[in-house]
């Protein structure tokens, strides 16, 4: 297990890139729109991990609601696991509250699921199973 990325919710991806890419000098590895989630994302590698910038593209998304309530800032911590199905099953048997009891697959082959902050001491935790070279 390792930290895959730390996600930061932003209202304007381009404005955020002015700081992270142009100011800090972090390279942009990937920019993608995830229609299912209603977000535009950018991954910027930092050592063996990434910063993920997440901008809502619709007002009815979880990220848009989060930004309205909290403003821009850290949204979640993502842990990379080798077998997400086994991890989710193990967490469920321990009574851990899962937002996604089953993994969701992105177009690039990455499978992910979220653990509810109530079970993770206030932190939204995402689990990632990377089956391709994306974001690693």
Task: Indicate residue ranges for each PLM-predicted region.
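A cross-kingdom feature marking solvent-exposed beta-strand/loop segments within repeated
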Residues: 2-4, 26-36, 58-75, 94-111, ...
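Short, structured motif recognition centered on aromatic/hydrophobic residues
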Residues: 3, 17-20, 44, 51-54, ...
